[in-house]
Regions:
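Fold-level recognition of mixed alpha/beta catalytic cores in primary-metabolism enzymes, strongest
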Residues: 100-103, 108-221
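Acidic/His- and Gly-rich active-site-bordering loop/insert found
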Residues: 1-108, 125-134
Length: 221
């Protein structure tokens, strides 16, 4: 718990140093390193930590406290976006640097920084009151940046463990550093295949335009 108490910024530097790019198998060691780092921090906080296997990257499912207490569920993800294009970075994307009071590195904001904030806050709560009456389920996945393909199945299998009175999602944003917001909803992803059928042969727009329905018009409708 000491690094979360003594130097949350250093904890974030360490977390960022793992290149946990889920979309590229060449970063597999970085993904596992970030996962192990998060598990270690949660164990330091007194959580019981389980790794739930998935076809791609395991999900961290950690719990702490008496199940009869009010229940809080916290969500985050340990994977990050690829750092490309590298020539737009002025420093190593996985070697976080501080400039003008901000820490720059891939994943510092999305989503490792918010997790360290939550863990550091919990470390202070548990230091002052080890038996704080709150049951916490901490969920950290490793596939968010590739669309969370394993997440729906995980939710179905573990929905009883994920019951809570409050859900805290550490993957939102703010209009500015001096503006605190409460985000109550997020857009999801939707993948679909659309088939549009038109004339069986090419037709010149200068001759047939307007007289026949253009497939592009149907697509726009």
């Amino acid at each position: 718990m000491s690094i979360l108490l003594d130097s949350p910024v250093d904890a974030l530097r360490q977390y960022v140093s793992f290149p946990s790019v889920s979309a590229d198998q060449s970063f597999a060691d970085g993904v596992s390193g970030a996962r192990e780092f998060a598990c270690s921090r949660l164990k330091e906080l007194g959580f019981e930590v389980d790794l739930i296997p998935t076809p791609i990257h395991p999900i961290i499912l950690a719990t702490r406290g008496d199940p009869s207490w009010p229940r809080l569920v916290i969500y985050g993800h340990y994977d990050v976006q690829p750092p490309d294009p590298l020539d737009l970075w002025t420093t190593d994307p996985f070697d976080a640097v501080e400039r003008d009071g901000r820490l720059y590195g891939r994943g510092a904001a999305d989503n490792k920084g918010p997790q360290i904030v939550h863990m550091s806050a919990l470390a202070r709560v548990f230091r002052d009151n080890p038996d704080y009456p709150l049951h916490i389920t901490y969920l950290i996945e490793g596939e968010e940046e590739i669309g969370s393909p394993s997440f729906r199945g995980f939710l179905g299998e573990h929905k009883q463990k994920l019951q809570g009175d409050l859900l805290l999602v550490s993957d939102t944003g703010s209009p500015g550093a001096d503006q605190l917001v409460v985000t109550t909803g997020l857009r999801g992803l939707s993948a679909m295949e659309v088939k549009i059928f038109g004339p069986k042969q090419d037709l010149h727009s200068g001759v047939h335009g307007g007289a026949l329905l253009n497939p592009l018009q149907a697509l726009m409708q």
